[in-house]
């Protein structure tokens, strides 16, 4: 069994702030604690970056690649970032 501290949930978003808020709320409601949530903001223009800065969520890591990489590109970017953080398993 993998320790929750070695798990990263990768969430990719682009101009879907309301859906991102729902997704993060669901992740916060998990009974397992200690995992990392890595949000890849694909250069959103809807206030997503500002919203993410206001959060006080343990384990939250935010990345903005500076351009919209698309869904698959965003997940590939997020998985690379998660590996750089030392995670052993990724939720996508």
Language-model features, listed with the residues they occupy:
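Cell-envelope/extracellular polymer assembly enzymes that use nucleotide-activated donors
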Residues: 6-8, 36
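Active-site beta-to-alpha loop of glycosyltransferases that engages the nucleotide-sugar donor
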Residues: 11-22, 43
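Residue-level preference for short helical/loop micro-motifs built around acidic side chains
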Residues: 18-21, 46, 50, 73
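Short, acidic, metal-binding catalytic loop of nucleotide-sugar glycosyltransferases
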Residues: 25-34
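A conserved acidic beta->alpha catalytic loop
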Residues: 26, 41-50
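Short beta-strand/loop segment that forms part of the nucleotide-sugar
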Residues: 35-43, 63-65
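Glycine-rich, basic loop-to-helix element that forms the pyrophosphate-binding segment
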Residues: 65-85
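Short beta-strand-to-loop acidic/aromatic patch adjacent to the donor-nucleotide binding site
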Residues: 86-92
């Amino acid at each position: 069994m993998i320790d929750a501290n070695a798990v990263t949930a990768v969430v990719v978003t682009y101009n879907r702030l309301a859906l991102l808020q729902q997704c993060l709320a669901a992740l916060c409601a998990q009974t397992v604690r200690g995992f990392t949530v890595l949000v890849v903001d694909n250069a959103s223009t809807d206030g997503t970056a500002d919203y993410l800065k206001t959060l006080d969520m343990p384990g939250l890591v935010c990345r903005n690649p500076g351009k919209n990489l698309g869904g698959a590109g965003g997940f590939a970017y997020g998985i690379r970032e998660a590996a750089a953080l030392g995670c052993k398993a990724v939720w996508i």
